[in-house]
Amino acid sequence: MKLVIVSGRSGSGKSVALRVLEDLGYYCVDNLPLPLIGTLLEQLKGSNDLVAISVDVRNMPEQDKVLVKQLASLPPDTELTSFFLNSSDKILLKRYSETRRLHPLSKSQVSLQEAIKLEGKLLEPMSKLVDHYIDTSNLNIYDLSDQVRQILLGSVDKELVINFESFGFKHGMPTEADFMFDVRFLPNPHWELALRPLTGLDEPVAEFLNRQPLVNKFIWQIENLLETWLPHLERNNRSYLTVAIGCTGGQHRSVYVAEQLAKRFSNGKHKVYARHRELNNAKA
């Protein structure tokens, strides 16, 4: 089992790192007391091989010897990776002032500046024990996300899931679409009596549409558009992309185009799915 522990000063980016881990398939738990790690791993054994927890100052032991003992008591098959995120006092003070959030130690009747300094002192033992120390003072959320992915995967690229979904406009537009293309202007197999009862998944319909230069040109242009912008979407920490293709009824043209696009992009590094809303609804 792989375990990632994310610690650090409040406001340094622990939540950002945890979101990256969640996107990578980790089962994430925020602010788990260290003595409960063993119990958590035992509960998840066999069902989750990737686990990540974040630990803040409220859950840290006061002595570093206790911390070392707790980490040493992890199950022997645990592959541990640890991060400590830090920022300068000035940057942390600025971030808290901008977000107006309450610092975890502010309840002790101390000022924000004093709470930030106190937290740094309390977390110092942890900062010396971790595998990866990241100063986020000059990093934005995208830079930090890239660093975490680089450490865990050896690459800043994330696996983007692309869903090509066909639909019929007369049944309503999908609300989850990131891109939406209207193919109602393409030649319609519906007017061919032999093709009318078939769908875009059937070979006769596919052959009919494949013979249409306008159809092939449109598919090629969508493919080029997506290939141009996919790297930028990935850099923007996007995990899912839904491309909706709509025709009148969602039976012929949109199904064929969605299938063709899914085939073309399935040869790359992305996870690609084709979903046909109206066909699925007809089966239900």
UniProtKB/Swiss-Prot annotation:
UniProt organism field: Shewanella baltica (strain OS185)
Binding site for GTP: 56-59
Functional description taken from the UniProt entry: Displays ATPase and GTPase activities.
One term of GO molecular function: GTP binding
Residues where ATP binds: 8-15
Domain of life: Bacteria
InterPro entries registered for this protein in UniProt: P-loop_NTPase (IPR027417), RapZ-like (IPR005337), RapZ-like_N (IPR053930), RapZ_C (IPR053931)
A Pfam family annotated for this UniProt entry: RapZ-like_N
Keywords from the UniProt entry: ATP-binding, GTP-binding, Nucleotide-binding
Protein name: Nucleotide-binding protein Shew185_0683
Lineage: Bacteria, Pseudomonadati, Pseudomonadota, Gammaproteobacteria, Alteromonadales
Keyword S-adenosyl-L-methionine included in the entry's annotation: no
SUPFAM superfamilies assigned: P-loop containing nucleoside triphosphate hydrolases (SSF52540)
Family: Belongs to the RapZ-like family.
